[in-house]
Amino acid sequence: MHIPQWTVTALLKLTRANRAYLDPAAARKRIAKRALLPQPIVPRFFPGKTQVRIKVTYSAGQYIYVLVPNDQQPRGAFVYVHGGGWVNQIAPQHWQLAAEMATTTGRAVLLPIYPLIPFGTAAQVIPSIGRITLAAKEKFGEVALGGDSAGGQIALSAALEIRKTATMPIVLISPALDATFSNPHIPAAQQADPWLGVPGCKVFLEEWAASTPLTDPKVSPLLAPATELASLGPVTIFTGTADIFNPDAHLLAHKIAAEGGHYDLVEEPSGLHVYPLLPTRAGAAARAQICALMRTH
């Protein structure tokens, strides 16, 4: 069952979902609240839960949940880094996407539970995601890497870190790409975005960066040299136009193309932030496209 996107937009506005992203003070309160009251990791139910087997391992300083299809040996792996503004825990929508990917592609889907701010930092997490990805490649033979929002930033930064050792297909959903927010088209995108806001994102990113400069590719993968971005495996970017991260998605595609790299930019007109995770018709189509992509790589 799909719901119209306008109902999601209305709900976001009604609940003031962007409060912590528009107001720096509210962003700091969110960090303090999450530190004191951590969110649950595994939901009691999510669509597709009964179709997969779930186990948990511990590696590179993180718990990693592994979803594999029932009664099948996995063929390859997908390391998926959840989003949440570097401050929010993995959500049921991430679990639903992971289950759908596992059952329709036959891959093992790995969900690293990385430390969030104020405890986790880019310098700590990026190398560990790289190690987890390389270990998955060694175990399963083929590996893809992806993530949404903050998780997209982490995934792309990790791919840059390990590019000289291994490359793989990369899937980015509404990725955060540049912590400096210097793209001149972002203010216009902000007017259309009912979910995110630059002021709060800057607070979260400054906490995430810690002592790492905001311009470092560990924090802002878009600012890596174009030659390095183009040397990665094929990059598929899903982005909606009602998202403050949309302008940087175009810049990423441009930088990859300028050096002859392989990319695909999938843009949803009026699409919300992380629209492939939403229970809309456009979201379902994007999830199907992601799964089809994973079957062909």
Could you say what each language-model-derived stretch is?
Residues 1-70:
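A glycine/proline-hinged amphipathic helix-loop "lid/cap" segment
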Residues 61-65, 71-297:
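Alpha/beta-hydrolase superfamily serine-hydrolase fold, recognizing
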